[in-house]
């Protein structure tokens, strides 16, 4: 499934099966009407936004909106323009985005539970939580994954080669073959790009 990625980055061979399993689980989640939630800190927060961006709009494939929605839009002024330019999303929520909620909760309650609070608000049983922490020990991520377990949300972890506590909790562990944070993050980007490509290819067939 991901031979091209492994050919470019052969050090990923030991985690090939886990990457493919993550792709399969995300596809199953979307087929059942679920969504993907993503969180991380610092550079991993940027990765969270990046993943959501690739899923919510066209990446490499054309994504026409559903025909029934298009028909409804064509009944209204500017409907054709809207229908022709919107792209069908794969539902994703970056839990790093909601500054009003985040700042209010951080000010009023427990700072380390900020991602857990958002997961509680946005998540549903059967969703997937992509938890990114290069060390695998970020407290706010660990609290969120514990909540995810209780809610019936499957967890895919992105960490460095050690994995930390996060890899002990996650359902699918993606451990980048590096100890250094910046190198692990470089692997993470290549992996989640491939993940987004393969998920998109499953649902949309026509190249842009």
Put a short name on every predicted segment.
Residues 28-122:
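Glycine-rich, small/polar surface segments that engage phosphate groups of diverse ligands
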Residues 121, 182-208:
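A charged, well-structured terminal subsegment
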Residues 129, 155, 172-174:
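Short, well-ordered beta-strand core segments
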Residues 157-169:
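Short, glycine/polar-rich helix-capping loops at beta-to-alpha or helix-loop-helix junctions
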């Amino acid at each position: 499934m991901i031979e091209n990625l492994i050919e470019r980055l052969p050090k990923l061979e030991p985690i090939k099966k886990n990457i493919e399993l993550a792709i399969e689980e995300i596809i199953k989640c979307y087929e059942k009407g679920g969504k993907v939630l993503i969180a991380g800190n610092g550079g991993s927060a940027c990765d969270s936004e990046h993943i959501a961006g690739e899923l919510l709009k066209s990446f490499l494939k054309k994504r026409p909106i559903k025909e029934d929605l298009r028909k409804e839009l064509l009944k209204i002024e500017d409907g054709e323009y809207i229908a022709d330019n919107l792209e069908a999303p794969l539902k994703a929520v970056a839990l790093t985005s909601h500054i009003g909620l985040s700042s209010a909760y951080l000010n009023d309650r427990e700072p380390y539970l900020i991602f857990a609070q958002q997961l509680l608000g946005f998540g549903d049983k059967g969703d997937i939580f992509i938890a990114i922490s290069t060390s695998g020990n970020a407290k706010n991520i660990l609290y969120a994954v514990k909540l995810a377990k209780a809610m019936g949300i499957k967890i895919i972890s992105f960490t460095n080669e050690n994995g930390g506590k996060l890899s002990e909790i996650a359902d699918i562990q993606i451990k980048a073959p590096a100890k250094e944070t910046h190198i692990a993050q470089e692997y993470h980007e290549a992996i989640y790009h491939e993940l987004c490509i393969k998920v998109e290819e499953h649902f949309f067939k026509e190249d842009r």
